[in-house]
Amino acid sequence: MWPLSHRHLCLAFLLVCVLSAISFFLHIHQDSFPHGLGLSVLCPDRRLVTHPVAIFCLPGTPMSPNTSSPCPQHAASLSGTWTIYPDGRFGNQMGQYATLLALAQLNGRQAFILPAMHAALAPVFRITLPVLAPEVDSRTPWRELRLHDWMSEEYADLGDPFLKLSGFPCSWTFFHHLREQIRSEFTLHDHLREEAQSVLRRLHLGRSGDRPRTFVGVHVRRGDYLQVMPQRWRGVVGNSAYLREAMDWFRARHEAPVFVVTSNGMEWCRENIDASKGDVVFAGDGQEASPWKDFALLTQCNHTIMTIGTFGFWAAYLAGGDTVYLANFTLPDSEFLKIFKPEAAFLPEWVGINADLSPLWTLAEP
């Protein structure tokens, strides 16, 4: 009986291999077969909203900051292979991940991330998109598409089964209709969340020693932006006057707030942010090579003050609550405004405080 059983096992193994090969073939070439999944099926309540910068508002985009009504997901209908180049720093890659996920779902495609993006984000978040093996990446007949930084109608009807996206998208107009799913993807690992909450639990207001009632995360972007903004983009970073006004905005609206300051320029913050009221804590470590500790702190706060940059955007987006941001931080003729649309960058309910552009006028004088 042994030869018969052995033969049966071999036949069963061959059958499994054949079925697996057929399944893989159908997944890769599913786009060649009629599946009839248009936008009317994916999102039957699809609405277009006219916007001054041609922003395409996706179905289910919530009007209030803490709700979400995503399009129905049809996991079984996903076909093809989409990915995105991982480029830039931590916040850039978060934007690329969220945009890839949203656009792939909208177009009925399977999204994959490349190993470099997985290495950047997986140690921090519970991300779920599968990783594309390098050998598959190198052999796939990609069409490449560079995205601009706001959702456009043409992005909702991309017919390419093998698409590699690029660019630095970080606009709520791509993914806000999936807000709860995005927040789930960017859930901190337990040890990072617990460490951040432990830091916040130890904070006390300086004058009274009382526990704070409200935690306001403050992210001050400095570093390379000190040169890039004025020299390349004719813009500024947040100064001490802006931060003082933003903090006063929260002091007027929230009882006993404490401001948890993080930055890649902590020395400047200690010298230029007024901490005399006892409600400012310089908590960030400013380590750009390992930014997740600062990021975790910011997301565990109730509200956010941001200056510029994708790191601050994502901290505010995940924290929820009120957000104050630096508005109009470039001159009107800046080339930056060709690639950056404020309406698409900042949620409508966020509060903007205009930047002081006088240093730029001084630089422009002969």
Swiss-Prot record:
Pathway: Protein modification; protein glycosylation. Keywords: Glycoprotein, Glycosyltransferase, Golgi apparatus, Lipid metabolism, Membrane, Signal-anchor, Transferase, Transmembrane, Transmembrane helix. GO terms for biological process: carbohydrate metabolic process; fucosylation; lipid metabolic process; olfactory bulb development; positive regulation of cell-matrix adhesion; positive regulation of endothelial cell migration; positive regulation of endothelial cell-matrix adhesion via fibronectin; positive regulation of sprouting angiogenesis. It catalyses: a beta-D-galactosyl-(1->4)-N-acetyl-beta-D-glucosaminyl derivative + GDP-beta-L-fucose = an alpha-L-Fuc-(1->2)-beta-D-Gal-(1->4)-beta-D-GlcNAc derivative + GDP + H(+); a ganglioside GA1 + GDP-beta-L-fucose = a ganglioside Fuc-GA1 + GDP + H(+); a beta-D-Gal-(1->3)-beta-D-GlcNAc-(1->3)-beta-D-Gal-(1->4)-beta-D-Glc-(1<->1')-Cer(d18:1(4E)) + GDP-beta-L-fucose = alpha-L-fucosyl-(1->2)- beta-D-galactosyl-(1->3)-N-acetyl-beta-D-glucosaminyl-(1->3)-beta-D-galactosyl-(1->4)-beta-D-glucosyl-(1<->1')-N-acylsphing-4-enine + GDP + H(+); a neolactoside nLc4Cer(d18:1(4E)) + GDP-beta-L-fucose = a neolactoside IV(2)-alpha-Fuc-nLc4Cer(d18:1(4E)) + GDP + H(+). It is a single-pass type II membrane protein. Glycans are attached at residues 66, 302, 328. Residues 1-8 are cytoplasmic. It comes from the Eukaryota. It is found in: Golgi apparatus, Golgi stack membrane. One of its GO terms (molecular function) is galactoside 2-alpha-L-fucosyltransferase activity. Catalyzes the transfer of L-fucose, from a guanosine diphosphate-beta-L-fucose, to the terminal galactose residue of glycoconjugates through an alpha(1,2) linkage leading to H antigen synthesis that is an intermediate substrate in the synthesis of ABO blood group antigens. H antigen is essential for maturation of the glomerular layer of the main olfactory bulb, in cell migration and early cell-cell contacts during tumor associated angiogenesis. Preferentially fucosylates soluble lactose and to a lesser extent fucosylates glycolipids gangliosides GA1 and GM1a. This is Galactoside alpha-(1,2)-fucosyltransferase 1. It comes from Lagothrix lagotricha. The gene is FUT1.
